[in-house]
Swiss-Prot record:
The keyword Electron transport does not apply. Keywords: Cell cycle, Cell division, Chromosome partition, Cytoplasm. Signal peptide: none annotated. The keyword Cell division applies. It holds the Pfam family SMC_ScpA. Participates in chromosomal partition during cell division. May act via the formation of a condensin-like complex containing Smc and ScpB that pull DNA away from mid-cell into both cell halves. GO terms for cellular component: cytoplasm. GO terms for biological process: cell division; chromosome segregation; DNA replication. This is Segregation and condensation protein A.
Length: 247
């Protein structure tokens, strides 16, 4: 590896191997769907070697990822099967890793959004609830589904949402898009009590819209405006309007 390819990074700055890989990709503006696996593997291993020379405690998951990268790299070094037709589809050895990176990037953006929201939230003074006592709202914001179940279902949504491939560096969480999706969802629930998440996204054209709707669902759950229910694991999400004061 030449000096131009070396990226010296500090271990404490990363939460795990996917975080490190994503940083290497973003910092060099690499297309995540066309990762130069030899180059990235070399940079990844160079950083692990440097951390070891500094006697840093490196989690085992970093070495697991290293073996994964080396396995993918080795697959590119193997001779191609001459008996396979040129136009016959062969799965890209990087496909599974790319999927993990895309999913990690999406959830990273979501986490960053809520962290920013918490930091920007102004100090508020508590007041008596305006909701009628007869219409008690349960304190659990996600209704009959847990946060982990909701996150796992969203992973399934990402896998099923086979649209144009977004550049990871371009996946953004915009306040405006969340407001638009909040309005979109409220309009959906204006004349009926419930709708489904899959029904809402069926005509969406890009991943940003799906992320925006997901965040809008979380916002409305937190504000006790809707409940989220699920009839089976990884199934569709039923979004139900919470009626207060008879409205």
């Amino acid at each position: 590896m030449n000096n131009a390819d070396e990226l010296t990074l500090d271990l404490p700055n990363f939460t795990g191997p996917l975080d490190l890989l994503l940083h290497l990709i973003r910092s060099q503006k690499i297309d995540i769907y066309d990762i130069p696996i030899a180059k990235i593997t070399g940079q990844y291993l160079a950083n692990l070697a440097r951390w070891q020379t500094l006697d840093l405690q490196i989690a085992g998951e970093y070495f697991v990822m290293a073996s994964t990268l080396l396995r993918i790299k080795s697959q590119y070094l193997l001779p191609k099967n001459d008996f396979v037709e040129e136009d016959q589809y062969q799965e890209d050895p990087r496909a599974e890793l790319v999927e993990q990176l895309v999913q990690y990037s999406v959830f990273q953006r979501i986490a960053e959004y809520f962290k920013k929201r918490d930091e920007e939230m102004p100090i508020t003074v508590a007041k008596d609830p305006s909701v009628s006592p007869k219409k008690k709202v349960e304190p659990l914001p996600l209704g009959e589904i847990t946060s982990d179940e909701l996150a796992n279902t969203f992973k399934v949504v990402l896998e099923r949402f086979k649209l144009r491939k977004p550049q990871v560096g371009q996946i953004e969480v915009h306040e405006a898009s969340i407001e638009e999706m909040t309005t979109f969802l409220k309009d959906k629930l204006h004349h009926r009590k419930s709708t489904s998440f899959f029904d809402c996204i069926k005509n969406f054209q890009d991943l940003d819209q799906v992320i925006g709707l997901f965040l809008a669902v979380l916002e409305l759950c937190r504000d006790h405006k809707i409940l989220v229910k699920q009839n089976r694991d990884f199934g569709d999400l039923e979004l139900e309007k919470v009626e207060t004061n008879g409205k």
